[in-house]
Each structure stands twice: as C-alpha cells, then as structure tokens.
A protein has these predicted regions:
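Bacterial N-terminal signal peptides
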Residues: 8-17
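Bacterial N-terminal signal peptides that target proteins for export
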Residues: 1-9
C-alpha cells in the first residue's frame, strides 16, 4: 500500500495543513453506486479517486511507457481503456482488480510504425473499440506516410487484439465518441459521423468547411476525449465575427464557441458562448444547467451561453488542461499538467480541495468521472 496525502479546503480558504492519509490498494474493488474519477500520470499509473471523500481510492500500475494517458471507460464502468506507450498502444484495465484484460497495438503491418493521436473510444454497447491509426512505412532509404485507417477491435479479444474490420480514414482525426445507435462521431477537419460497419465518413458539423455568414474559419485545438454526464460529444472552437461583408479584422468580434453532438439523438449544435479573451484547453457544460459553460487552462472560467457573457473566473495555482464535473454539477475537478487534482465549487468558483497523486505529472491526460 502507498500512503497519499490529500488536502481539503473550506470554500474561500487558503491551502493549509489540513492533510490526512489515504491508502491506495490495487485489490480494492469499486463500490456500486459510488462516484469515482480516473486519471493517469507518470511513470505509468492509473489512479481511481473516490469523489465522496475526495481521496485516492487505488492506483493501478500500467505496462510499458506513459503517454498520452487518455482514458475511455466501458459502458458498465468496469474497464478503463488507456491510449499509452507514446500513442502506440491501447490497454484495457479491469478497475476492480487492476488486471490487464485487453491490449491492441496501433501498428498492425510489417515495416510500419503507427500512432493514434487521441483517436480512440469504446462502442455504446462495449463490444467494440475504435482507433484511428496514422501509419508510416519505414524503408531502408526513406519513410512513406501512408493513408490513415479506422481499425475496429472486439473488446473481448484479449491481450493480442487484431482489427476485425479496417477502413480508410481522413487525415487529422482526433477525439471520438460512440452514439447510442452505434454511429461513431469523430473530430477532424470537420466533425464526422461514421458507419462503423461500412467505414463511410459523412460530414455532420462543418468546421473547416463551415459557411456561416460573416464569420472567419474556426480554429479548433481539442484533444480531451471526455465522456460527460450530459451524454454529449463536444469540443471548443474560436472564431471572429465580422460586422459586415467587408470583413475587417480590426472591427471583428473574437468569440469562443462549442460544437456538440447529443449522443442519444444525434442532434448537433454550433453555439458561440462568449468573447475570446484567453485560451482554454478543455471546456464543459454544467450537468445541472446546460446554459452554463466552463473552460480551463490558465484560469477557470464560467459563461452564460444565452447572454454570451463571462460570469466568473478563478485564479489557479498553475495551468490545468482537463476539467470534469461530478454528477450533481456542484464540483469541478481540474487535472492534467502537474500531479495534483484541484477541486472547485461550481457555484462560488472557490477552490475547496486538492488531491496530490503519487508519481509524476499527468501531462496531457484525459480524466473521466463516473458512477459505478
């Protein structure tokens, strides 16, 4: 067992010596009905945090190397699938036992080296896992960049999983989620819907190719593949809204916005939510009030979507890349970058806790919050 120091805060108070010890035991099974958070960090840890106590519950040791540490959960919340080993492999870890139950290499053919740039997820029924491979053929005198492919794996294939289907895919694909009807939604130059049986990609939300009058082309940097309580697939964009057809950049209004797909219905949304005053790496709507939008990087910010207005912003000890809500929407958990998870009250925007994890930085991990 490993002793972990966890420090909680009263709202509005400063960090103090209110620490206690939590024990992280690989053999601890998760409890039905309890809410947890999973995140990863160096050297190669998968952590489970109990959100009732905001304490580390257990730590699973992962094989091979860390990076990026992106986590996707099976629908029954029993298995965490992690893209790791420098973007080269996907591992499935049973959360109750820390046992590895799945492994797939992104590289599938002799002579190639392939990586997935955050592009993987689990199907809505948990039976399949999807990845986008970006292969390069390593020849004696040159490298050949090959066509990306969408690979489909059976999740019960064990530790040497091979694709059961493969299809050509567009370039520059990143995060993805599976809809309730089996449609795969993938972010790239546009947001696509994909038939995973035929490999057909169809533009669902134009991004690079949008035609919004008097708007500049949007800019999208979003690699945090979040499974949300709102059951949506969302990513942020920035754009400029011009005053007229002259499209003068000097008078344009810089804006932040949100692309979103409802995973239950497939309904899409392209919504500006506020002025662009700073950069956020990830953002999420409140589970209890869909009109409230939050974003994080160097500050934690809250917006009123209808009014397109910044309501509050909180100062952070350091940058955080990834944000998550608890199910009630009352607390926000900030992860990524260093080795601590910061906890904020969603209403007051005051820090109310901090969990320091064993090991090193979380870097560019994607954390997930769930109820078993």
């Amino acid at each position: 067992m490993r002793a972990i120091t966890v420090c909680g805060l009263a709202a509005g108070a400063v960090l103090s010596a209110c620490s206690f010890t939590a024990l992280a035991d690989e053999g601890l099974a998760l409890n039905s009905g309890h809410e947890y958070m999973v995140t990863t960090n160096y050297p190669n840890n998968l952590h489970v945090i109990d959100l009732a106590s905001d304490r580390l519950y257990k730590t699973c040791k992962m094989p091979d190397a860390f990076g990026p540490g992106t986590v996707q959960l099976s629908p029954d919340r029993k298995i965490a699938y992690v893209l790791n080993n420098h973007y080269a492999d996907v591992y499935g870890v049973e959360l109750d036992s820390c046992k590895q139950v799945f492994h797939a290499s992104i590289t599938q053919h002799p002579g190639e080296k392939a990586r997935s740039m955050f592009a993987f997820t689990v199907s809505h029924d948990g039976k399949e896992l999807y990845t986008v491979a970006n292969p390069t053929l390593l020849l004696n005198d040159r490298y050949e960049v090959k066509e990306p492919r969408l690979d489909v794996y059976a999740t019960d294939a064990g530790l040497d999983a091979k694709p059961v289907r493969s299809f050509p895919a567009p370039r520059q694909l990143t995060i993805m989620q599976s809809g309730d009807d089996g449609t795969l939604y993938v972010a790239g130059p546009d947001v696509y819907k994909v038939d995973v049986n035929t490999g057909q990609f169809t533009v669902l939300i134009p991004s690079r190719h949008w035609k919004r009058p008097n708007y500049s082309a949007p800019d999208v940097l979003y690699v945090w593949n979040q499974q949300t309580y709102r059951h949506d697939f969302s990513l942020l964009y920035t754009t400029a809204k011009f005053k007229d057809k002259q499209q003068d950049p000097a008078t344009a209004e810089p804006l932040y916005g949100l692309f979103s797909v409802d995973l239950a219905t497939g309904k899409t949304e392209t919504t500006d939510f506020g002025p662009l005053t700073e950069i956020y790496f990830s953002g999420m709507r409140s589970p209890k009030d869909p009109n409230l939008m939050f974003g994080v990087l160097n500050r934690l910010a809250k917006y009123d979507i209808k009014q397109k207005k910044l309501l509050q912003a909180a100062t952070l000890e350091h940058s955080y890349y990834c944000m998550s809500f608890n199910r009630a929407g009352s607390k926000i958990y900030l992860s990524g970058t260093f080795k601590d998870v910061a906890i904020f009250d969603a209403d007051s925007m005051q820090q109310v806790g901090k969990i320091t994890l064993p090991g090193g930085d979380m870097a560019i991990t994607t954390a997930q919050v769930f109820v078993r």
